[in-house]
Design a protein with these regions (language model features):
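Conserved hydrophobic helix-helix packing surfaces used for dimerization/oligomerization
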Residues: 5-7, 28
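Conserved S-adenosyl-L-methionine
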Residues: 9-11
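N-terminal Rossmann-fold NAD(P) dinucleotide-binding loop
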Residues: 14-15
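Glycine-rich FAD pyrophosphate-binding loop
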Residues: 22-42
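Conserved N-terminal glycine-rich FAD pyrophosphate-binding loop of Rossmann-like flavoproteins
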Residues: 35-55
Length: 148
Protein backbone atom coordinates (compact mmCIF):
# COMPACT_ATOMS: atom_id res chain seq x y z
CA UNK A 1 0.00 0.00 0.00
CA UNK A 2 1.05 3.63 -0.45
CA UNK A 3 1.49 6.20 2.27
CA UNK A 4 -0.57 6.66 5.39
CA UNK A 5 -2.58 9.84 4.79
CA UNK A 6 -4.57 11.92 7.26
CA UNK A 7 -7.37 14.07 5.85
CA UNK A 8 -8.45 16.85 8.22
CA UNK A 9 -12.06 17.66 7.43
CA UNK A 10 -15.04 15.59 6.37
CA UNK A 11 -16.61 18.15 4.06
CA UNK A 12 -16.99 17.85 0.31
CA UNK A 13 -13.31 18.55 -0.40
CA UNK A 14 -11.91 16.29 2.31
CA UNK A 15 -14.17 13.36 1.47
CA UNK A 16 -13.47 13.70 -2.27
CA UNK A 17 -9.74 13.81 -1.54
CA UNK A 18 -10.04 10.73 0.69
CA UNK A 19 -11.74 8.75 -2.09
CA UNK A 20 -9.15 9.83 -4.67
CA UNK A 21 -6.22 9.05 -2.34
CA UNK A 22 -7.70 5.66 -1.45
CA UNK A 23 -8.17 4.87 -5.12
CA UNK A 24 -4.50 5.76 -5.70
CA UNK A 25 -3.52 3.10 -3.15
CA UNK A 26 -2.99 5.12 0.02
CA UNK A 27 -4.19 4.23 3.51
CA UNK A 28 -6.48 7.14 4.39
CA UNK A 29 -8.08 8.22 7.65
CA UNK A 30 -10.53 11.14 7.75
CA UNK A 31 -10.80 13.26 10.90
CA UNK A 32 -13.90 15.45 11.24
CA UNK A 33 -14.59 18.01 13.98
CA UNK A 34 -18.34 17.47 14.29
CA UNK A 35 -19.53 14.37 16.12
CA UNK A 36 -22.50 13.74 13.84
CA UNK A 37 -22.28 15.03 10.26
CA UNK A 38 -25.65 16.32 9.03
CA UNK A 39 -27.09 17.61 5.78
CA UNK A 40 -26.45 21.34 6.06
CA UNK A 41 -26.24 24.11 3.51
CA UNK A 42 -28.00 25.24 0.39
CA UNK A 43 -28.14 24.30 -3.27
CA UNK A 44 -24.96 24.08 -5.32
CA UNK A 45 -24.12 23.34 -8.94
CA UNK A 46 -21.65 20.65 -9.89
CA UNK A 47 -20.06 21.53 -13.21
CA UNK A 48 -19.33 18.74 -15.71
CA UNK A 49 -15.60 18.56 -14.93
CA UNK A 50 -16.35 17.89 -11.24
CA UNK A 51 -19.09 15.40 -12.13
CA UNK A 52 -16.50 13.53 -14.20
CA UNK A 53 -14.34 13.02 -11.11
CA UNK A 54 -17.32 11.84 -9.07
CA UNK A 55 -18.36 9.44 -11.86
CA UNK A 56 -14.79 8.09 -11.98
CA UNK A 57 -15.11 7.43 -8.23
CA UNK A 58 -18.19 5.28 -8.88
CA UNK A 59 -20.82 7.76 -7.69
CA UNK A 60 -22.77 8.14 -10.93
CA UNK A 61 -25.93 6.39 -9.72
CA UNK A 62 -25.97 8.16 -6.34
CA UNK A 63 -25.58 11.57 -7.98
CA UNK A 64 -28.28 10.91 -10.55
CA UNK A 65 -30.67 9.89 -7.77
CA UNK A 66 -29.91 12.85 -5.48
CA UNK A 67 -29.54 15.69 -7.99
CA UNK A 68 -31.27 17.39 -10.89
CA UNK A 69 -29.48 17.38 -14.25
CA UNK A 70 -29.27 21.04 -15.26
CA UNK A 71 -29.85 21.60 -18.96
CA UNK A 72 -30.13 25.39 -19.15
CA UNK A 73 -29.11 28.53 -17.30
CA UNK A 74 -31.51 31.47 -17.65
CA UNK A 75 -31.48 35.07 -16.54
CA UNK A 76 -34.91 36.66 -16.39
CA UNK A 77 -36.20 40.11 -15.54
CA UNK A 78 -38.19 40.57 -12.36
CA UNK A 79 -41.39 40.21 -14.39
CA UNK A 80 -40.27 36.87 -15.89
CA UNK A 81 -39.05 37.99 -19.32
CA UNK A 82 -36.01 35.96 -20.38
CA UNK A 83 -32.96 38.16 -20.89
CA UNK A 84 -30.39 35.49 -21.64
CA UNK A 85 -30.04 31.69 -21.65
CA UNK A 86 -27.30 29.18 -22.25
CA UNK A 87 -27.32 25.37 -22.43
CA UNK A 88 -25.54 23.48 -19.65
CA UNK A 89 -24.19 19.99 -19.06
CA UNK A 90 -25.19 17.38 -21.62
CA UNK A 91 -27.39 19.91 -23.45
CA UNK A 92 -24.27 22.01 -24.05
CA UNK A 93 -22.41 19.06 -25.57
CA UNK A 94 -20.43 18.09 -22.47
CA UNK A 95 -19.79 14.37 -22.00
CA UNK A 96 -20.93 14.64 -18.34
CA UNK A 97 -24.01 16.31 -16.91
CA UNK A 98 -24.16 19.40 -14.76
CA UNK A 99 -26.04 18.74 -11.53
CA UNK A 100 -27.90 20.99 -9.11
CA UNK A 101 -28.25 19.56 -5.62
CA UNK A 102 -28.23 20.31 -1.92
CA UNK A 103 -24.63 20.58 -0.70
CA UNK A 104 -25.46 18.64 2.45
CA UNK A 105 -26.86 15.77 0.40
CA UNK A 106 -23.65 15.69 -1.66
CA UNK A 107 -21.63 15.56 1.56
CA UNK A 108 -23.71 12.60 2.80
CA UNK A 109 -23.30 10.78 -0.54
CA UNK A 110 -19.54 11.26 -0.25
CA UNK A 111 -19.46 10.25 3.43
CA UNK A 112 -21.36 7.04 2.68
CA UNK A 113 -18.97 6.29 -0.21
CA UNK A 114 -15.91 6.88 2.00
CA UNK A 115 -17.26 4.60 4.71
CA UNK A 116 -17.95 1.88 2.12
CA UNK A 117 -14.54 2.19 0.47
CA UNK A 118 -12.30 2.75 3.49
CA UNK A 119 -14.40 1.25 6.28
CA UNK A 120 -16.37 3.10 8.93
CA UNK A 121 -13.41 2.91 11.31
CA UNK A 122 -11.42 5.17 8.95
CA UNK A 123 -13.78 8.13 9.49
CA UNK A 124 -13.23 9.58 12.96
CA UNK A 125 -15.82 12.16 13.95
CA UNK A 126 -15.54 14.47 16.95
CA UNK A 127 -11.81 15.00 16.33
CA UNK A 128 -10.74 18.64 15.88
CA UNK A 129 -7.29 19.28 14.39
CA UNK A 130 -5.53 21.54 16.92
CA UNK A 131 -2.15 21.76 15.22
CA UNK A 132 0.67 19.84 13.61
CA UNK A 133 4.45 19.68 13.26
CA UNK A 134 6.22 18.65 10.11
CA UNK A 135 9.81 17.67 9.43
CA UNK A 136 11.52 16.10 6.44
CA UNK A 137 10.19 12.62 7.25
CA UNK A 138 6.72 12.99 8.71
CA UNK A 139 3.85 15.06 10.01
CA UNK A 140 2.56 14.74 13.57
CA UNK A 141 -1.00 15.98 14.11
CA UNK A 142 -2.60 16.99 17.42
CA UNK A 143 -6.35 16.63 17.93
CA UNK A 144 -8.88 17.80 20.49
CA UNK A 145 -11.52 15.17 21.30
CA UNK A 146 -14.97 16.72 20.83
CA UNK A 147 -17.06 13.56 21.04
CA UNK A 148 -18.78 14.54 24.30
Amino acid sequence: MGRSVLVAGGGIGGLSAALCLHRAGHEVTVFETVSEPRELGVGINLLPHSVRVLHDLGLEAELAAAAVATSELRFCSDDGVMIWSEPRGLAAGNPWPQYSMHRGRLQMVLLEAVRRALGSDRVLTGHHLDGFEQDADRVVARFVDRRS
